[in-house]
Each structure stands twice: as C-alpha cells, then as structure tokens.
Design a protein with these regions (language model features):
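Alpha-helical membrane-anchoring segments
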Residues: 1-221
C-alpha cells in the first residue's frame, strides 16, 4: 500500500504500514548484529549451541533445534530474515511473511535462552504479535478490523511497558539519585566510563535519570 504522509488523513491501514516499515528497519539492524557475531555462535564460540542445547530437556525438540542451529542453517535463517525485512519495507506484509518472522524470532529467543537485547527483543515480539493479529484477523474477518486490533495490541503493550518501567524507576532511590544511571553505563558494552566522562558526574547522571523517569511515566499521556 502506498503511504499517505498527510497526518490528518491517516487511517488504520496507513498506520500499520508505517509500523511495518519502521519495524523492518529495526529488524535489519538486529539481524546484522547477529550476523556479525557468527564467530561467537560457532561450535568454538562463547555461545556455542552444543553447550546451550543441554538446557533442552525433551529429546525430539533438542534434535529439531540441532538442525535449526547448525551454523549453515542458522546463517541462512538470518539472511532470509534480512530478505523478509526488505520485502516488508518495499512491498508490505502478508500473513505468511509475518508468521515466518514470528516463528524465526521465537527460534532466535531460544538460541539466546531469552532476550539478547532486553527491551528491544521484547518490543520485536510485541510488534510481530500485533502484525500477526492484524493479518490473521484481516485475512479471516475484515482488513480494517485486523489493522485496528493489531495496532491496539502494540499500543497497549508499549504504553504499559514504558509506564511500568518509569514507575519502577521512580520508586527506586538509586534511580532518583542518578546512581543507577552510572552503574548501568559502566556495565554497558562500551563501558566503563572514563573517570572524567561527563555522564559519570552526579549532576548529569541525575538529569539523565529523571529524563528517563519522566519520559516513561508520561508515556500514556
């Protein structure tokens, strides 16, 4: 569907199409990150499947996942994910395409034994579920009803998640004082912060913490 960029005339189908495009761009970024980490997921890597498979108790499930997570199959899945995201951007979604991405995302979550990027992975699952609802209801009942149902699902999940996150931060003294911000940044992938980094100063840490708290708590409004 061609996009109409006039905000006043946006309908459910147009809004869903915008979400598809933004989501697909995010999906490409995530998938490129996974592809760049192929050395870490090899049989000799830090996240080797022969070790992680020991957590799977059911034999037939373990055998099925052994096939899915062979290095070649896993890489092919990631490349197919990129191609599917491209189709989502330039052509648009379908129930089959979204179902493939949804099942593939579940496999990736299993591969990492849960969320790899935390909130990003959670929101990926939320948007995929919303799109699955939209195309499932749309193909079986009504396209506009499906689009509205999918959008409502994504909105409710997103708004409540951010609001709850902000509320928890508001109740925690380490977030109100800025200490949690410094701890988080020091433990991040690019941390620890240099001793004289401006974000390690308490004043800026407090500003940053309260910016997050207020932004997340104000999300429903």
């Amino acid at each position: 569907m061609p996009l109409n960029w006039t905000i006043s005339s946006v309908n459910s189908a147009q809004a869903l199409r915008w979400i598809e495009i933004l989501f697909a761009v995010s999906l490409v970024i995530q998938t490129v990150e996974y592809l760049r980490m192929s050395h870490a997921t090899s049989t000799q890597g830090l996240w080797a499947w022969p070790i992680q498979r020991l957590d799977i108790p059911t034999a037939w499930v373990r055998r099925f996942l052994d096939i899915c997570f062979q290095p070649f199959c896993h890489q092919m899945h990631l490349w197919m994910r990129c191609v599917s995201a491209g189709i989502l951007i330039f052509i648009g979604g379908s129930f089959a395409l979204i179902a493939f991405l949804f099942i593939g995302n579940l496999l990736i979550l299993i591969r990492w034994r849960g969320a790899f990027n935390g909130g990003s992975d959670f929101l990926t699952l939320v948007v995929l579920t919303g799109l699955l609802i939209a195309y499932g209801v749309g193909s079986g009942v009504d396209a506009d009803l499906g689009a509205r149902a999918g959008l409502w699902y994504v909105c409710i999940q997103s708004v409540t998640s951010y609001f709850m996150s902000g509320t928890v931060k508001l109740l925690r003294p380490e977030w109100r004082s800025g200490r949690a911000m410094i701890i988080f940044l020091n433990a991040a992938i690019y941390g620890p912060l240099p001793p004289r980094h401006w974000l390690s100063q308490r004043f800026w840490a407090v500003i940053g913490s309260w910016a997050f708290i207020l932004w997340e708590c104000a999300f429903p409004f």
